[in-house]
């Protein structure tokens, strides 16, 4: 299982880790920087002598992660420079602490940095939680980073991407890879954010499920191996392995019904019945002969037969599809219902 968190959820888990679990913020920042350093070393340690890293650091804790990363890379023998973007007087306390420490390491920090001399660009401007369009010198910095030809790495979330929705807020850093901290952010898997994030690595920085304190993220995905199918009874038969009823496929959309039926069988259903337009009968019976067939007129009498009901794939937006939806949701079978986008369209048309 992979959790997909919002900015608000991530901030709460970060706070819980610090205040309730007793892991200090600077420790979390150091671990974030170590995770980013590990990623860079995996890619570039073999060519360290030819690798020059430029980090664009904002004034928040994401920028602090960038400063800590600069220190670690410099200590490991990399050529590193930091370009600060923003008003240092408004920097966070952790940022200021990292900045003071960085002065003892061979890291270039002056304003006259030739960006095109560097072949690894690190975005540490904003991180998670950006909610306003990127403007002014921040937008200039993003555009400057995007114009370089080097490898581009984002820390936590590419600057300019809404971490909740994946929307581009004005302009955004186009990364080759993103190292995100703690849990994956929704905006890294939703487009267009996923395209801007590139390869995504979720790093363990010490913020784990213990930080939920009873409030788990609302969204997650199943990974390979997360779903374990039940072991089938050797003495069972197709009637004991579950019955799936599919309301799918308007006239001319029989393919959607066939694909849905095949998916039901592949995920373990013993019997599958397809309720579809009468014009699709021959195509479906040829395409998946093991499935049962029923017309829309037979829907009501089929509801009690099913253990699970799916409605939506390819049913279109005609009156007949709407009547099928009403038949299902007005019955006791609605508790066994899964749906698709078309289902949501009809629900909205009924309610609004």
Tell where the protein language model's regions lie, with residue ranges:
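Short, small-residue-enriched loops and turns at beta-alpha junctions
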Residues: 89-90, 128, 317-318
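Internal gly/pro-rich beta-alpha loop/helix module
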Residues: 119-120, 125-216
